[in-house]
């Protein structure tokens, strides 16, 4: 599916919620807006990696974020989250997108996600690694210290995490919602899989031949 067709399909299906589209309750209409198509997913992976390099984000982390959210498919969330990265509509105001339906554009959706994720990544404190022993994370199957990439993903999903972690005297007892802990676990697995595919491809970025390989740009 081309970028133009993806946008047109998403807008057409989302328009059933009314003229405001993404701004109205979507619980009755949530779900994927296109069939699961491996070719479309690969097309979007290429786009995601391009955006990540431009935004100074680890491409594999951004890919893993999209895989965790929607398996990199156009999607309308229960609370009207938009696109493959499930960006909340109110971010359109922060990013000065007019109209907010621009968030359905796959590239814009990925850029928004990259910037939100990068902001979360910058909020890391080394002591947050001890949250790996948090009861909720352990119950979700987490083992070992919490890493920075997963903390950023956890914050992407649960925006209050930096404030809650900063105020906690014992990170083991922070009341992380079970759904958020499970999200962090899925992201970590998706990140390992993304990096595993890269190693299998000799670290060649999606959409590039080995001769044109470029190094990934990490968050800064």
Locate predicted features.
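Residue-level detector of well-ordered alpha-helical segments, enriched
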Residues: 61-64, 83, 148, 152
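Membrane-interface starts of transmembrane alpha-helices
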Residues: 37, 58-59, 81
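Non-catalytic cell-wall polysaccharide-engagement segments
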Residues: 16-41, 46-47, 53-55, 90-220
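Sec-dependent N-terminal signal peptides of Gram-negative exported proteins
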Residues: 2-17
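Short, surface-exposed helix-loop/turn micro-motifs enriched in polar/charged residues
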Residues: 57, 76-79, 144
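N-terminal secretory signal peptides
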Residues: 53-61, 65-67
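Cell-wall polysaccharide-cleaving catalytic domain and substrate-binding groove, primarily
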Residues: 48, 67-93, 159-162
């Amino acid at each position: 599916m081309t970028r133009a067709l993806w946008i047109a399909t998403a807008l057409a299906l989302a328009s059933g919620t009314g003229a405001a589209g993404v701004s109205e309750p979507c619980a009755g209409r949530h779900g994927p807006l296109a069939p699961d198509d491996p070719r479309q997913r690969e097309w979007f992976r290429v786009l995601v990696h391009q955006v990540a390099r431009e935004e100074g984000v680890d491409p594999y982390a951004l890919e893993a974020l999209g895989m965790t959210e929607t398996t990199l498919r156009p999607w309308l969330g229960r609370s009207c989250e938009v696109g493959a990265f499930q960006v909340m509509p109110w971010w359109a105001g922060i990013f000065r997108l007019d109209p907010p339906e621009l968030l359905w554009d796959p590239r814009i959706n990925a850029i928004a996600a990259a910037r939100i994720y990068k902001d979360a990544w910058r909020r890391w404190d080394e002591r947050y690694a001890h949250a790996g022993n948090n009861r909720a994370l352990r119950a979700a199957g987490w083992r070992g210290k919490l890493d920075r990439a997963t903390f950023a993903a956890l914050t992407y999903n649960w925006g209050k995490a930096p404030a809650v972690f900063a105020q906690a005297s014992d990170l083991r007892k922070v009341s992380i919602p079970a759904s958020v802990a499970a999200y962090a676990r899925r992201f970590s697995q998706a990140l390992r899989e993304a990096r595993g595919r890269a190693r299998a491809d000799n670290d060649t970025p999606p959409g590039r031949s080995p001769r044109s390989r470029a190094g990934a740009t990490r968050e800064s």
